[in-house]
Swiss-Prot record:
GO terms for biological process: D-tagatose 6-phosphate catabolic process; lactose catabolic process via tagatose-6-phosphate. NCBIfam families: 1-PFK, lacC, PRK13508.1. It catalyses: D-tagatofuranose 6-phosphate + ATP = D-tagatofuranose 1,6-bisphosphate + ADP + H(+). InterPro entries: Carboh/pur_kinase_PfkB_CS (IPR002173), LacC (IPR005926), PfkB_dom (IPR011611), Ribokinase-like (IPR029056), Tagatose/fructose_Pkinase (IPR017583). CDD domains: FruK_PfkB_like (cd01164). Pfam families: PfkB. PANTHER family: 1-PHOSPHOFRUCTOKINASE, 1-PHOSPHOFRUCTOKINASE-RELATED. It is an enzyme of class 2 (transferase). Keywords: ATP-binding, Kinase, Lactose metabolism, Nucleotide-binding, Transferase. This is Tagatose-6-phosphate kinase. GO terms for cellular component: cytosol. Its EC number is 2.7.1.144. GO terms for molecular function: ATP binding; phosphofructokinase activity; tagatose-6-phosphate kinase activity.
Amino acid sequence: MILTVTLNPSIDISYCLENFNMDTVNRVTDVSKTPGGKGLNVTRVLSQLGDNVVATGLLGGDFGDFIRSGLDALEIRHQFLSIGGETRHCIAVLHEGQQTEILEKGPHITKDEADAFLNHLKLIFDAATIITVSGSLPKGLPSDYYARLISLANHFNKKVVLDCSGEALRSVLKSSAKPTVIKPNLEELTQLIGKPISYSLDELKSTLQQDLFRGIDWVIVSLGARGAFAKHGNHYYQVTIPKIEVINPVGSGDATVAGIASALEHQLDDTNLLKRANVLGMLNAQETLTGHINLTYYQELISQIQVKEV
């Protein structure tokens, strides 16, 4: 079973407008409200793949109940911890081919709630083989909280796929608690290193050889339309993907995480892990809805992905 962790979920609201005018009334022609957050995008894709997945994290208030009901409607199992605060909204205004986002920070998590969630994980870890940890930390949680969570997962011999950035990721990399996989994009990798990084294979290879990444089994760097560059142990791979028509790239990284977790769950080899990860990211980009894939095109696309050891 794959357990997905979303500590700062949201209700994602999309407003579709023909025109977006400031300082006046805008009439919405179409609106959608769905359970959101990076980890729940991962969850939906895994569910669509047919993998055995359970979602966990922190939910509070009526908005938290809305997310539970939304997952129930999709027949996705979940075991969230209830908190005192109200789960947040994230609003996307789609207008004239553009997207304007308004993101709430979310509830403040108390120390008691933070400790309770780690205890909650101890009770549900046994059934899981793979843990995905995605997204930002909500207010109240220290920057080393993911490191504490990963340390707990390691104690239970669980593989962890981590998708976060900034201080939360830096704190993990500096700790003794190492995840199995991290998936930075080139911008996030640049922020970690503190200097610009090009698409040069030699530069990417030397970057991933730095001590900062020691102890991490897989480092998979997303390069957007250029594919990916990956390090697995002492092996390095260049992933080349075909050109596709991109409808909505939001959530493609989450779909990629789902592919990594699924490949680990099914014990795929390096080449097929990288292919599954990348094809799911591409399939998500071809859909209007975030965290959705159309498996009709799976074989057609995956057959065009090239993985080369370098």
